[in-house]
């Protein structure tokens, strides 16, 4: 065998040009692959999942000539992005959330507690819009929480009607401006809240019917602001301080529909405060608590109370040491009196309490500290019709009774709460 010598490749700089033509006999493909120990791949069917509909139609008609790809002139405008077709909803059984009407979604959202409602509000824009619907925010319970005043304002702006927030902490300054609230029932008892913040919040409340500010530091502007709530029915200012007798007079003169009033134990009340209060009591009051004023409440004040509030059903004058048994005839003028509290009125002689048993409408009598334990049973036997010393605390104008587990506010159960067990 004679080998042919390789020809010298000419220099590129020369004028000689060389062209190579590659060819392959397709019949030898299987022989070559067999020698390599592999086999040829079978021709797969065309995967139409990622191919646009236009190309699919061309694949169905092989006789049609293929489209020539036009080479662009360097411009990006010649490129076209073809989107993958959406999957048919028929592949997914059930009803889509997007097809549910707003009313049905609101009904579902109404079964959620506050943490879950806040969570679903972040799903999409539609759910966020629905989560702000006023029907979901009728009642709110944030008792015992550390709240920023701005957060409280935003929540009230969502249309809250009943707001239960006792023993909470809102000491930070209130910054943003806000509009009027729809709240009608509010409990801020024993909270730590800045006087300025409290004034700003209450100044936007003009529809209050029930309000409890027990134990809070107030001011004359705050008390006068409350006077704009002409529909106020229950007011609890027990243990409050920081306002003058003129503010008390303005408040009671404006709230002409009051039914329950608790002005007990306002520790900076003077004799003038008590006189201003009793002189402006509306005649609609049926439950009144003016206990805790020791020497500042006189018999003359009791006479004024009886005259201005003839429809009293429940009266608490405990810890008024200036009251004696000579004031008993005044109680007989109250034709509807059922519950009377005279605890720790030490100048009342225990034996004279038998006279109160002659009040035909009277049902309960609280005389803690007056009757010794040894003679209490004798008094109960002498007055079998009355329940004596059956309640340690007053319920007048107070929003929540029984225990801290009670989430009601004047009989209204708050639906939105941070407690998980209320969720479905």
Curated annotation (Swiss-Prot):
Superkingdom assignment: Eukaryota
Gene Ontology BP terms: cellular response to cell-matrix adhesion; defense response to virus; G1/S transition of mitotic cell cycle; G2/M transition of mitotic cell cycle; innate immune response; positive regulation of double-strand break repair via homologous recombination; positive regulation of intracellular estrogen receptor signaling pathway; positive regulation of protein polyubiquitination
This protein's pathway: Protein modification; protein ubiquitination
InterPro entries attached to this UniProt entry: F-box-like_dom_sf, F-box_dom, Leu-rich_rpt_Cys-con_subtyp, LRR_dom_sf
Motif Nuclear localization signal positions after renumbering to this chain: 67-73
Cellular localization per UniProt: Cytoplasm; Nucleus
Main location: cytoplasm
Each LRR repeat, start to end: 151-176, 177-204, 210-234, 235-257, 258-284, 286-308, 309-330, 334-356, 359-378, 380-401
Cellular component, GO annotation: cytosol; nucleolus; nucleoplasm; SCF ubiquitin ligase complex
Residues bearing PTM Phosphoserine: 64, 75, 179
SUPFAM superfamilies: F-box domain, RNI-like
Domain F-box residue range list: 94-140
Membrane-spanning residues: none
Keywords: Acetylation, Cytoplasm, Leucine-rich repeat, Nucleus, Phosphoprotein, Repeat, Ubl conjugation, Ubl conjugation pathway
Any GO MF annotation of the entry: identical protein binding
Positions bearing N6-acetyllysine: 68, 71
Posttranslational modification: Phosphorylated on serine and threonine resudues in response to DNA damage, promoting 'Lys-63'-linked ubiquitination of NBN.
Location of the region described as Disordered in the Swiss-Prot/TrEMBL record: 52-73
The protein's role, per its UniProt record: Substrate recognition component of a SCF (SKP1-CUL1-F-box protein) E3 ubiquitin-protein ligase complex which mediates the ubiquitination and subsequent proteasomal degradation of target proteins involved in cell cycle progression, signal transduction and transcription. Specifically recognizes phosphorylated CDKN1B/p27kip and is involved in regulation of G1/S transition. Degradation of CDKN1B/p27kip also requires CKS1. Recognizes target proteins ORC1, CDT1, RBL2, KMT2A/MLL1, CDK9, RAG2, NBN, FOXO1, UBP43, YTHDF2, and probably MYC, TOB1 and TAL1. Degradation of TAL1 also requires STUB1.
Entries under PANTHER family matching the protein: PROTEIN ARABIDILLO 1 (PTHR46976:SF1)
Subunit structure and binding partners: Part of a SCF(SKP2) complex consisting of CUL1, RBX1, SKP1 and SKP2. Component of a SCF(SKP2)-like complex containing CUL1, SKP1, TRIM21 and SKP2. Interacts directly with CUL1 and SKP1. Interacts with ASB2 which is the substrate-recognition component of a probable ECS E3 ubiquitin-protein ligase complex; ASB2 is likely to bridge the formation of dimeric E3-ubiquitin-protein ligase complexes composed of an ECS complex and an SCF(SKP2) complex. Interacts with CKS1. Interacts with the cyclin-A-CDK2 complex.
Protein's recorded name: S-phase kinase-associated protein 2
Lineage start: Eukaryota, Metazoa, Chordata, Craniata, Vertebrata
Designated gene of the protein: Skp2
């Amino acid at each position: 065998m004679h080998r042919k010598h390789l020809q010298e490749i000419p220099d590129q700089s020369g004028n000689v040009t060389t062209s190579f033509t590659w060819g392959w006999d397709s019949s030898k493909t299987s022989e070559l692959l067999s020698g390599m120990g592999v086999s040829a791949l079978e021709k797969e069917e065309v995967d139409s999942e990622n191919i646009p509909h236009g190309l699919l139609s061309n694949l169905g008609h092989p006789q049609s000539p293929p489209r020539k790809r036009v080479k662009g002139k360097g411009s990006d405008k010649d490129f076209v992005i073809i989107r993958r077709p959406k999957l048919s909803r028929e592949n997914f059984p059930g009803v889509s959330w997007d097809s549910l009407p707003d009313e049905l979604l609101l009904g579902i959202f109404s079964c959620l507690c506050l943490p879950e409602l806040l969570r679903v509000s972040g799903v999409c824009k539609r759910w966020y819009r629905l989560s702000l619907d006023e029907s979901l925010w009728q009642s709110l319970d944030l008792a015992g929480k550390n709240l920023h005043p701005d957060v409280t304002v935003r929540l009230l702006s969502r249309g809250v009607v009943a707001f239960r927030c006792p023993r909470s902490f809102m000491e930070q300054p209130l910054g943003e401006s806000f509009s009027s609230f729809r709240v009608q029932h509010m409990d801020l008892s024993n909270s730590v809240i800045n006087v300025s913040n409290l004034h700003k919040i209450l100044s936007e409340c003009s529809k209050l019917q029930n309000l409890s500010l027990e134990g809070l530091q107030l001011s004359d502007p705050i008390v006068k602001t409350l006077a704009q709530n002409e529909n106020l029915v229950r007011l609890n200012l027990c243990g409050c301080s920081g306002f003058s007798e003129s503010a008390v007079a303005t408040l009671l003169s404006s709230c002409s529909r009051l039914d329950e009033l608790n002005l007990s134990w306002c520790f900076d009340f003077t004799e003038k405060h008590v006189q201003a209060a009793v002189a402006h009591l509306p005649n609609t009051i049926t439950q009144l608590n003016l206990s805790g004023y020791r020497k500042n409440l006189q018999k003359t004040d009791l006479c004024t109370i009886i005259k201005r509030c003839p429809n009293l059903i429940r009266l608490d004058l405990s810890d008024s040491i200036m009251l004696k048994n000579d004031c008993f005839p005044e109680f007989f003028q109250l034709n509807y009196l059922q519950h009377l509290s005279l605890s720790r009125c030490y100048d009342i002689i225990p034996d004279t309490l038998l006279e109160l048993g002659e009040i035909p409408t009277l049902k309960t009598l609280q005389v803690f500290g007056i009757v010794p334990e040894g003679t209490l049973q004798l008094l109960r036997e002498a007055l079998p019709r009355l329940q004596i010393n059956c309640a340690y605390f007053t319920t007048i104008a107070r929003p929540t009774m029984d225990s801290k587990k009670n989430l009601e506010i004047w009989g209204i159960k708050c639906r939105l709460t941070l407690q998980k067990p209320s969720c479905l």
